[in-house]
Amino acid sequence: MDSDSHSDSQIKEFYQLKNIAVVGVSKNDEKPSHQVPKYLIEHGYNIIPVNPTLTEVLGRKAYPSITDIPDKIDIVDVFRRSEDIPAVLDDALKRKKDEIKVFWMQSGIYNQEAERKAKENGIDVVYNRCMMEEHRRLFADEE
């Protein structure tokens, strides 16, 4: 599976956004869906966990859906199967217009229809990339 066509400088720009809703976050510390948000917290990002089966994870309140989050969201980072992506995007699109800047599908995740719909709504789309791996790769010299 290919990745999106964003340049490194574009991806670096996305990391200036600090409020990240992580959909599909896990309390299992062996899963990437736990390790990635933990890493992002350690690097100064405001992680907002989204998982309907959790009330708290990583020391933060978890929300059942993106639509339940009262705070601002800049990026939606998704750890769900590709076929679940359209429903996640639909929830994201229920937020205030122009609030969400980036819809990020983690490594191995892609849905063409969701990509098209997000772009039509002015949201940048990143897919088949890990937020932790990309951060490490792009900012390694700054750590």
Predicted segments — roles?
Residues 95-118:
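ADP-ribose/adenylate-binding Rossmann-like module
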Residues 57-60, 74, 113, 134-141:
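Short, charged, surface-exposed secondary-structure boundary motifs
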